[in-house]
Amino acid sequence: TIIHVNGNILLGEIKKLNDGIITYKMDGMGTIKFQVDKINTFKSEKSFQVVLKGGKQYFGSFDTCGIERHVKLILINGSDRLFIEDIIELYPIKKNFWLRTSGSLGLGFNFSKGSNIATLTTSGSLNHRNRHSYAELSWSDNTTYQSDSINSNKSDANLMIQRLIYRKWYLGFNIEGSSNSELGYKFRILGGVSVINYIIQDYHNRLYVSLGSNANREWSKDNDEVTNNMEGLLGINYHYYKYTDPEINITTYVNTYPNFTTSGRYRVNYYLDAKVEEISDFNVGINIYYNFDSKPISVDAARDDYGIATTISYTFH
């Protein structure tokens, strides 16, 4: 049961809460979504996983507490009173896999008649959360065509897993495969581990930094040369989400990789994906990437590569 700030009582079932939005299945009316700041209080006898702004997690059920904008969390060994807007994530414990899964699919295309150059961009992601971990699978492909031939290609696929250590601290694992003809490598496979700290974690913002190391293996585009490298990792990642009209979703990150194997070599990857919802779950936006390698594996390769594309995407929760 949810009690709205206007006094209305909504009967139904809480499906989840994240990004400042509660998903609620009302009796006889289907599923609705609305902002958490519209909730005065709520109650449910079901068990939930609760994540607060400070990173603390609880497992319990809810009851009203008689104080506006607050709720009583009922635990096995007691209870606690919570300010509703301090709850940033809420999931029923025994719900299925898909309730905790979200993602997006994107497509972009640019063409210049004067240069007869066309760029096709495809991208996508799948995200899943459970009690103590977060997993994300993402991929993208940027291919440039000129006069019916492929002029350059950049492809990436990455699997990242974050495992909760304590409050805002996570242990990160990632596996990545990529290719970039402009930077002179046919294929690179990478695996690494890092320590992650969420500096900001609230309704609209997620900001975290990561520090770690990885190992990679590269194949040159021009010859049979193969190199093995040990690298460090220093990264910063930011996500912004606004549900009110217009719905805005921004993800950006920059990762720096100092090379421990080749003296003086380092890599930098920057990425920005910004989109605005135009029709329910369909978005228009812009996608920008910039990659830099101070000492590419191929002698004739460029040291940097970048791309900008307008995109149309579909998101699902």
Task: Give the positions of each predicted feature.
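Repeated loop/turn-to-beta-strand initiation elements of outer-membrane beta-barrel proteins
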Residues: 131-137, 168-171, 203-207, 241-250, ...
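Transmembrane beta-barrel strands of outer-membrane/channel proteins
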Residues: 105-111, 124, 137-141, 157-159, ...
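Transmembrane beta-strands of outer-membrane beta-barrel pores
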Residues: 109-113, 130, 141-145, 177-181, ...
